[in-house]
Structure formats: structure tokens, C-alpha cells
């Protein structure tokens, strides 16, 4: 039987954005970056209120269908806890539908808030499982929860199982590595961009990506000089180029100049991993073409603070 959480208990969550795939690691590699949503959840006597400021304000629902609310409720269900009512406030800095893990961050914030309200009844692995279930893959979800870089994988259901099992492990990131995001002023639908991918790929291309994914884990941990080689990909970015022509053009322009650029998640954001700031002329050119350029540190794990009334 679910236990009741007292009215007045509140939680504030600071959740980082994330960049998925990192080139070759499709649905596998993820990286938390220093752009944050802040979500505050308070247990109330009844009802539901939702307030959204910043990114997504005026665009996302303010009822029980809001992703943060759905994630809170699922987290509470799994933790065998219940609340009479909720007040949810979101201060969003992560752009929506830009390939920076906004939906994974929302799900992570909701589940981690629920877990804190429920006295941390869930393990980290359970949290990642619940958050990933909203996404269908754990790369962004695990990065927002664990921080740093992650290697993730999914066990698909077999006979007798009803749901995929999601897993992730953290990877230490070399302290000199930082990320620069080139964020276009248009959005991309993850589902639409996934639909352009082929159902089968060649063994040659699969082997190419397996090797580059392995290289990327070394580049991230100990050898940033390998970042350009480690971000090469043949499994998804070439197929998405027509649907994301501006992004594909910028990836090529940056890579031709020796920068480790790749399509962040399903795009349209382009991410560059480097150990130095990019030249001002690149930033100025991108800005003149309508891209917002932000240099971001590698982020730590989600931060959760709980308060009691009085």
C-alpha cells in the first residue's frame, strides 16, 4: 500500500542538459553539459498547479500531461508513495526540441523529485530505468542523472518480459574537454528524424562505428587528441543530412577545419568537443547565420535538495 508523503514537503532539482550519440555512439553515448532546468515540487493538500518559465513557456501543457508531472507520478508509483496534491514550478534554460535532451531532463527532474519526496526509496539504477522508459533509450536520461559522460545499453524484452531493461555506467571526462553548442533557431522532431534511418546497415559501416565508439571512450577519458576521429559516424548522421541540411552543412564546415563536430542527438544542434575555445570568427559567422553559440562545461550529476515545512 502506498505511503502518504506529508503536505509541505518540497524538493528542488537542478538537472543538466545532455548531448547524445557523440557521433558514432548511436543510442549509447551521452554527455551532460552545463545548461540547466530547475524544477521545484511541493506537496499540497489537494489538486495540481504547474508553472513554467523560460524555455517552453506558453507552449507546454500546464496540467497532468506535462512531462515533469507524468514523471513525478510514475516515480511515486514505483516508490510506492502517494501525495494529496502537487505544485510544480519549472524554470527552463534547456531549449526544447533542439537535440539537448530537454525531454530527458524533464523526466529526470520529475523522477528524482519523486524519489526525494519518497525518502530515496529508489536506487540510482531504478531511477535510470524509470527515466529511460519515457525516452525509449537511456543515453540522454543517464547523462542527466549521472552527469559527465555515460555508456548506456538496452536489453530488449524476451519471452516473459514486458519491458526493456536500461543500463548505464559513468565515464570520467578529461578535465580539459568542453562543449560548444551551435543552436539553430528551428526545432526538430526526434521521431521524424528517426524515421529517415534505414532498418539495415552494412557490416562495413557497423564495424566502422563500433571502432569509433571505442575510440571515443578513450578520447573522452584520457586522450582528447582523438576527439575528431572518435566523433566520426556512418550510421545516422549521413541519413539525416537532407532533413537537417543547415546542421549537416555546419558539421561538415567545422569538421573540415579539424573540429570534433557532430549532430547532437536528433538535432538540430551541432556540438563541438574541444580543449580550447573556438576562434571568434567561427562564432561570429555562426551567429550571423542565426545560430546561438554557447560554450558549456561538462556537467556533474543532477542535484536534488529536499525541504520540510517549517
Swiss-Prot record:
Instruction: Give GO MF terms, alphabetically.
Output: ATP binding; homoserine kinase activity
- Protein name listed in UniProt: Homoserine kinase
Organism listed in the record: Corynebacterium kroppenstedtii (strain DSM 44385 / JCM 11950 / CIP 105744 / CCUG 35717)
Q: Which Pfam families match?
A: GHMP_kinases_C, GHMP_kinases_N
Q: For ATP, which residues are the binding ones?
A: 95-105
What job does this protein perform? Answer: Catalyzes the ATP-dependent phosphorylation of L-homoserine to L-homoserine phosphate.
Enzyme Commission number(s): 2.7.1.39
Q: Does the keyword Kinase apply?
A: yes
